[in-house]
Amino acid sequence: MFFKFMNYKKWLTKNTRTLSGKTVAISGSTGGIGKELCKFFCSLSADIILIDRNKARSDALKESLLEEFPNISLKAYYVDLENISAVRELAKALQNETIDYLVLNAGAYKIPRRKGENGFENAFNINFVSPYILADALLPKIKARGGKLIAVGSIAHNYSKIDVNDVDFATRKAPSKIYGNAKRYLMYSLWSLDEYRDTVNVAHPGIAVTNITSHYPKLIYAIIKYPMKIIFMNPKKASLSILYALFTETKKNEWIGPRIFDVWGLPRKKTLKTCSQEEAEKISELSKEIYLK
């Protein structure tokens, strides 16, 4: 198993296909996993639309990709996912693009906390509300083109259940629960869209050493950084589950992630039993209300 995983290029040949003539839009493209996904997409001849907050980093990535893959078409949009009004404007703009695949990869873990214009905390807006807005706007066209929307979930979704009296976990202190709550909303709200069952896939990278794992205090991070690199996957290998989601079908409540304890190895499909039908229906109901705020 381990040996096979190290030869992931063979896995790529077997489990992916050309994306020539297709366009992939990806949020959070400048992060560790985002960059690797962009390289994979370009190597499969896809055209790319980058969706990022930091213009300088996005432009640098764009330049790097075009240098390595000069024949692709590449556009960039800049938006802060905390800014709900800006995200709604972006959603309108993207409806004028031809998009076959949308990868909702952007996320934020431990960040300075503040309320957004819709009354919800920024981590909730970044990890759930903004991706949901983009999904709502683009799913009809993606479905019509026979494409896929890939929502990047997290094993953190299982750290707690939703609280209807504290939707965005504003009273909680643990970043893992705040982040996990938002991912729980994202995953189960999209799974509830039965008319898009064949269009929506949820995938997760397991645990990888990226910017999202650098939230620990500097001293602790300095100590654990290198052991983490040995124990967990690098961004390139962690991104394979998300890449695979473009090319496979899943059932409701089935996600794609590393096969060994959900943190290591080649991608596999797994049915989640982490949310009751009653809670899933409540997430669907609340998601529609949140979207309108």
Question: Which residue stretches match the model-derived regions?
Answer:
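Residue-level preference for long, well-ordered alpha-helices that form the structural scaffold
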Residues: 120, 127, 178, 182, ...
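Short, flexible, mixed-charge acidic loops at enzyme active sites
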Residues: 162-167, 215-219, 257-262
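A structural signal for well-ordered alpha-helical scaffolds and beta->alpha junctions
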Residues: 131, 183-186, 235-238, 280, ...
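C-terminal helical subdomain
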Residues: 87, 226-267, 277
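C-terminal tail/cap regions
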Residues: 2-4, 220-221, 250-293
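Rossmann-fold NAD(P)H-dependent dehydrogenase/reductase core
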Residues: 2-214, 290-293
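Generic recognition of well-ordered alpha-helical segments
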Residues: 192, 241-244, 286
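A glycine/serine/threonine-rich, flexible loop-to-helix segment
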Residues: 209-226
